[in-house]
């Protein structure tokens, strides 16, 4: 029973770590006042956008497509 509880705790910790790792690769790309979001990018995609002169900011996946986010985009345009 004790081993089962420990195994379940480890699985929960791993699940949280995977979610956080996935969220790191969501980012917002801005160029000449136009911003859009990328969530399914590859790891090196952030570097490629930066090299091209884009303003790249990491955004946690939970904040995507909320009303507040849309209002911020309207202010920038």
Swiss-Prot record:
It is found in: Secreted. Hemocytes. The modification Arginine amide is found at residue 40. Significantly inhibits the growth of Gram-negative and Gram-positive bacteria. It comes from Tachypleus tridentatus (Japanese horseshoe crab). It comes from the Eukaryota. Residues 1-23 form the signal peptide. This is Tachyplesin-1. GO terms for cellular component: extracellular region. Its main location: secreted. Residues 41-77 form a propeptide. Belongs to the tachyplesin/polyphemusin family.
């Amino acid at each position: 029973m004790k081993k089962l509880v420990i195994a379940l705790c480890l699985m929960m910790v791993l699940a949280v770590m995977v979610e956080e790792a996935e969220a790191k690769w969501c980012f917002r790309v801005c160029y000449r006042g136009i911003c859009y979001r990328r969530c399914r990018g590859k790891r090196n995609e952030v570097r490629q956008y930066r090299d091209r002169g884009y303003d790249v900011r990491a955004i946690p996946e939970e904040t995507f497509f909320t009303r507040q986010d849309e209002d911020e985009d309207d202010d920038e345009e």
